[in-house]
Amino acid sequence: MAYPNPFSRAIHTVSLAPEDVHSIVFWSKHYRPLLPYLEYLQKKGFCMFFHYTITGLPRYLEPCSPPWELSTTILKELSLRTSPRHVTWRFDPIVITEELDSRWYIRQFASIGSRLSGFTQRCYISFVHLYGKTRRNLQRLGIKFREPSLEEKLELTLELEGIAQGLGIEVLACCQPDLVAKGIKMGRCVDGELLSKLFPERTPILEHRPTRPGCGCTASKDIGMYDTCSLGCTYCYANQSRTLAHIRRQRHDPSCQMLLPTP
């Protein structure tokens, strides 16, 4: 498969032959389209790990995400067909606004977590990184957001951690070095140590290769592309606009070696 560097536009290639791939780490808010192909991929010999984002944020932030109640049902099915260790729940990003304060996130986390207890062992959290594009999108919709203080972040994280512990779920922080410095466990989205335990038949890949400050990830290849997700989340940094993402998705050719054919 070929994929472009999002900045230099240089084209890179990577083999997707099962014998050449240690494992595939997926990120998604909606795995239902994948479920019919899961058994096929497993029989082909692919080792797979899943990050499943379920937040229940309002439509003005996540206009096209599935209802969180549906997402918990799909996560359960995915977990039953793999294992609770193979599926990680992501409750991120946390966006603090006038409406969405700490109390809202605590209630929402407890509601979602109570449905997922026994079906996942980990939950990754992070507070929204206010990139310029993210700020503009929020401001355009008139959303009054603010950057919480470290004390607020830590207090909320500890509240979520306490709820999660009662549900048998471990909370980890993704790219939040300020929280890690206060004792919150660092998340590793591409966790070579965990993947080696899940797939012991594969040669371990343990090289630490962070993608940004506070990242704990193992070396990997990101074969996704910007401006291809049409869910249109307001806080997203990977899309210029939902319209552009729709246009680009229409150009997708399953027979092409890239998600999108080159112009």
Describe each model-derived feature in a short phrase.
Residues 151-216:
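A C-terminal junction/extension of Radical SAM enzymes
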Residues 1-61, 73-82, 242-263:
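Conserved Radical SAM active-site core
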Residues 70-137, 159-175:
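Conserved C-terminal portion of the radical SAM core fold
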Residues 213-240:
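Local cysteine-cluster metal-coordination motifs and their immediate loop/turn environment
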Residues 136-144, 184-190:
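Short, surface-exposed, charged loop/turn segments at secondary-structure junctions
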